[in-house]
Amino acid sequence: MTADISLRPADHPAVRFGKVGVLLVNLGTPDGTDYTSMRRYLREFLTDRRVIEWSPWKWYPILFGIVLNTRPQKVGKAYELIWNKEQNESYLRTYTRNQSELMAGRLKDLDNVKVDWAMRYGTPSIGSRIDALKEEGCDRIVLFPLYPQYAAATTATVNDKAFQKLLSMRWQPALRTVPAYHDDETYIEALAASVERHLSTLDWKPEMLLASFHGIPMSYFKQGDPYYCQCQKTGRLLRERLGLTKENFLVTFQSRFGPEEWLQPYTDKTVEKLAKDGVKRIAVINPGFVSDCLETLEEIAEQAAHSFHENGGEKFAHIPCLNDGEDGMKVLEKVVRRELQGWV
């Protein structure tokens, strides 16, 4: 919509207004698997004080002296294993773009809504897409961090970056931030349907189903982060929906980094122990990841599977994330429509 300029000076610029933006935001991705791309991405990620809460005086000598000189090669090789070579990008970027495009189609009944996507680290940046939505005439924006469970290191830092952008804007759009949806019925049903659909394709039945969530340091939880509790609730609701018992369903936590104690039980150690204890068949789902990415495709589908087989396990299944499938899009659409109420 363009403002009526009939009552304004002839040299007054046209102003676009009246649209509502929806900005889907995921964690981020390097632009490539080479050293330079990986180092640039890891530097932005690991200098975020929401992610690493250590004092910079303590952390930066380690980060710039060791981590950023060794991790880019290692992480780059891991990304190469799961890189979307057809589009020369990570699958997280592919899925997030697809989710944005599909969401726009699902909201076509709302002609004043514009949908876009961004990454907290890497490109496209949150600030650049807020600018783009503002240029489209969006004076209200729903900011949707794509994390079912809230954590300061994920949801909060997305919000921080958006608020930081607003600090530089003369005419700020109104901003709504989407809360966690860890216990949403549609979300739980989508997870359960995904488990049932995938397991129905196997000629064997798992003895144990692991729900593996990304971990956070235990100290963050002790300081009041609700993430652990929300993960446990998601796990409990999923277990109950699937009709499983505590003996054949377990919530675990993966991707720990550094010397601190993280949320437990650890996924990698649990997988290894199950195999050594004689469990022969397991399946793993990642309920906290909206889209498949390095942590699911490489860390679970590759590393965890290898560990299970190396320690005596026989059958391992990784259940894909909801990604841009119909069930996953139903979940995201429900959340977006709920948050748009009063604006459309």
From Swiss-Prot:
Concerning CDD domains, the annotation shows:
Ferrochelatase_C, Ferrochelatase_N
* EC number in record: 4.98.1.1
Name the record gives this protein = Ferrochelatase
Pathways per UniProt: Porphyrin-containing compound metabolism; protoheme biosynthesis; protoheme from protoporphyrin-IX: step 1/1
Xref: Pfam families: Ferrochelatase
Which keywords label this protein?
A: Cytoplasm, Heme biosynthesis, Iron, Lyase, Metal-binding, Porphyrin biosynthesis
Record carries keyword Secreted: no
Q: Which SUPFAM superfamilies match?
A: Chelatase
Gene Ontology biological-process entries: heme biosynthetic process
Q: Which GO terms describe its cellular component?
A: cytoplasm
Q: Which GO terms describe its molecular function?
A: ferrochelatase activity; metal ion binding
The record lists Fe cation as bound by H214, E295
Q: Which reaction does it catalyse?
A: heme b + 2 H(+) = protoporphyrin IX + Fe(2+)
Any idea where this protein resides? Answer: Cytoplasm
What Gene3D superfamilies does the record point to? Answer: 3.40.50.1400
Which InterPro entries would you find in this protein's record?
Ferrochelatase, Ferrochelatase_AS, Ferrochelatase_C, Ferrochelatase_N
